[in-house]
Design a protein with these regions (language model features):
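Domain-level recognition of soluble alpha/beta enzyme cores
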Residues: 239-265
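Active-site-proximal alpha-helix that buttresses catalytic centers in soluble enzyme cores
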Residues: 5, 18-167, 188-190
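Generic beta-sheet signal
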Residues: 94-95, 212-226
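Internal catalytic-core helix/loop-beta-alpha segment
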Residues: 186-216
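Acidic, His/Gly-rich catalytic cores of divalent-metal-dependent hydrolytic chemistry
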Residues: 268-283
Length: 283
């Protein structure tokens, strides 16, 4: 502003502007600048999110699953289409992700990577926690890796009536190259192979309820840290490359829910507060 005033003063001397004329010019310049740089009373008055929520992230919006009528369709066919669009989900899906307990991670073969004594205690504590929560659990799903199966076995003994299934898609792996990069180098083909599988697992288990589902569901999924961290980023529509910045304790509980309209929320991330301090571990 000081330099601007100096220039105007110089011009007034050279071109013979009057003082009043110079003041008028200054006023016009200040006014134009204020229009280009408005000041708001709060950031919320004119806030545009950098990334907007994709409501059709699971491709289950009614318009995506119901075939539209042809241009030559009759009025009755068009009316039927509109009625089908009104049939939308009403239930919420709760997905409880549980990391396996501590295990012997220095073994090379999966069959030998069993739970340690501490890992078995952790799984027992998590099972007891699920019992105390007393939700109408729908089913128990687990990875086919040894440490996940052993964790699921211990939990299932405390919830014996719960239907159980296993899924190879939930096996541990490298979902996507992390950002910033990890100090542990991995060949690109590993991300290429594991990433597609873990993404397939996400698409299989993460979606809003079907319109036919009338009650909220509570599914328990026992799997692995990398898989869970990737799921959290994808479900919340955060950059998935950030998965490695999240840390999860062994046998911890991560709770995501999917509303009928496609909104997703995170209730807990890596909850292990139900364990005594000396039973908590991450590696």
């Amino acid at each position: 502003m000081k330099r601007l005033l100096q220039k105007i003063y110089h011009c007034s001397k050279v071109y013979g502007f009057t003082a009043a004329g110079a003041v008028a010019i200054v006023g016009i310049v200040i006014y134009e600048r204020s229009r280009n740089n408005p000041v708001f009373s709060s950031w919320t008055t004119n806030h545009d999110p950098s990334v907007k929520w994709d409501y059709n992230w699971d491709k289950r919006e009614p318009e995506s699953v119901i075939k539209p009528p042809k241009e030559t369709a009759t009025d009755d066919e068009k009316l039927q289409y509109k009625e089908k669009l009104k049939k939308v989900p009403t239930a919420t899906r709760h997905i409880i992700l549980i990391r396996h307990g501590q295990y012997y991670d220095r073994e090379s073969l999966d069959i030998n990577r069993k739970l340690t004594d501490l890992g078995r205690e952790q799984a027992q504590l998590t099972g007891a926690r699920l019992v105390d929560m007393n939700y109408p659990w729908s089913k128990l799903i687990c990875s086919t890796m040894t440490r996940a199966q052993e964790t699921a076995d211990i939990i299932h003994k405390q919830l014996p009536d719960l239907p159980r299934e296993e899924c190879d898609l939930l096996r541990e792996g490298a979902p996507i190259p992390p950002e910033p990069p990890s100090g542990n180098w991995r060949p690109e083909k590993q991300f290429y192979k594991d990433g597609a599988r873990i993404e397939a697992a996400f698409r299989k288990y993460f979606h809003r309820a079907d319109p036919e589902q009338t009650n909220d569901s509570y599914e328990i999924v026992v799997c692995h840290a990398n898989v869970i961290r990737y799921f959290v980023c994808r479900a919340l529509q955060f950059p998935p490359e950030g998965w490695l910045r999240i840390s999860l304790n062994h046998a911890s509980i991560t709770w995501l829910y999917i509303r009928p309209n496609g909104r997703v929320g995170l209730r807990t991330l890596g909850e292990a507060g139900f364990m005594p301090v000396n039973k908590v571990s991450v590696l």
